[in-house]
Structures are given as structure tokens and as C-alpha cells.
Amino acid sequence: ENVAFPLKQRKIDTKLINERVINALKSVGLTGYENRKIQELSGGQQQRVSLARSLVKNAKILLLDEPLVNLDYKLREQLREEFKNLFSKGLADETILIYSTTDPRETMELNGEVIVLDEGKVLQVGPAKEIFENPNSLKVAEISNDPPMNIINSKISKNMINFEDISIDIPIHFKDIKDDELKVGLRSSDILLNEKGHEFEVELAEISGSETLLHLKKGSTKLIMSIEEVMNFKIKDKVKIDFKIDKAYAFSANGKLISSPFRSKNV
């Protein structure tokens, strides 16, 4: 009844309504739940009922506004996978799907055409992979990464990247950069523990699933690094780290992309 409601409002033939309801429920993995009351369903199942109700209308435009935002972690992962299958196989060819999310992982996994918005302004448009690999500005780099990309205020001198008391050989894709001052971008996964590395202080340690996030500080430089295992750290612990500098991004002082590990360009 819930899924069929928009079709009944249009006074569509009962047989056609039943066919479309069955197909919509099948698309969202709810075959066999046709006669359940909505209060008998879990939160995730109720979310899928809402999606089926949207699909059954065969609308030309389907808008999903953060459909996973209020669900627990396991259910989000499950539905994200189901959405992937649905969007690749279960939508009519003429249907345009607009999926709103603040989670970069959803953007990458659904892998469609992406519009990056900030306060109503379009910052970048393109395939998800292109935006992830080549964010055109600092703001896009922050929005399209979780945790946000680390940004390090740096100076370039004698083919070295310099910040705080640290000097690192510039990567090959920085060779043609003329700017003396840069904002160097590094993802949290491109910072590594290294006993022979540079000393930073732990400001915060978070356990997220099977991953550890360390918030680090050295002088005025603050970084977030991700470790793909659960590790115990305390605030003010000293850790030594190194950088996958070949994965670094270069942004100009005004925040425009100069060079990425995937593609170089002049501002």
C-alpha cells in the first residue's frame, strides 16, 4: 500500500500498479515484504521502502537527499552496495538520478558524474575519479576527501620542500613549479609511521572501525594521518612520521591546483 500510493493517486490500472510495485520492491531487495506493515520493518528497510516508492513512479528525475545519513555504519555499507547495483542496473535508461551527499566515499563508490557545491556555488564538475585525482582547488580537495586533505604551508628552495624544521626533496611533478611559496596537499593515507622520520606530537587519537586516525602537530603545522589497524596512542605522545611525497599536490597561495601526482598544469 505504501509503495503503491503515488500510483493510486494517478488512478492507474490495478494490474499495472501491482506489476510496478513488485518490480520496485525487487529492485531494492524487499521481495517477500509486500504485506508487512511499515512499523514492522527495520530502519534500513523503511529507507528502502521510501526508495521503492520513488522508483515506482518511473519519474524522469529522481532526487535522493543524503539517503544514508541517519543509518548505522553496517546498514550504510549494506545500502551503499545495494544503491550501486540499483543505479547501474535497476533504473530506467531515461531516469536522471540526483544523489546528494556529504560523504566522499559514497561519491567514489557510486562513481557517477559529480558536481561539487559549496554554499550554492559550483566548484568543479566531472567524473568522480577525475575530481578525486585532480581537485581543482583547496576547497574541492577538502570536500572530496575524508578526512580532509592535509594542507601544509611550504616554501620551495633548492629543489626542497621546506616547512617547520623539515626539508624534503621535491617530487618529479613539482620540478617545473615557479612559485616559491606553496600549499602542499597530502591525504591522511599518504603519511606513514617511520622511526627514522620527523617527530610530531599527538593531539588526538581516534579509532574508526579497524582504522586509527591520528591528529598531529608540529609548530603551526597540523596533520591527520590514517593507520589501517587499531593502535593505542595518548595525547602528547611523540610519533615519528614520513611522507609519500610522490603523492603530494601543489596548490598556489590562492588555492588553485598547480600540480597533482596524476597530472601537472600551470595556474
Task: Explain the meaning of each model-derived region.
Residues 105, 129, 138, 150, ...:
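Glycine-centered loop/turn positions within well-structured domains
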Residues 127, 139, 155, 201-203:
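Residues located in well-ordered beta-strands
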Residues 133-158:
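C-terminal boundary and immediately downstream tail of ABC-type ATPase nucleotide-binding domains
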Residues 77, 151-153, 193:
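Generic structural "secondary-structure junction" signal
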Residues 1-136:
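ABC ATPase nucleotide-binding domains
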Residues 149, 160-267:
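Non-catalytic connector elements of ABC transporters
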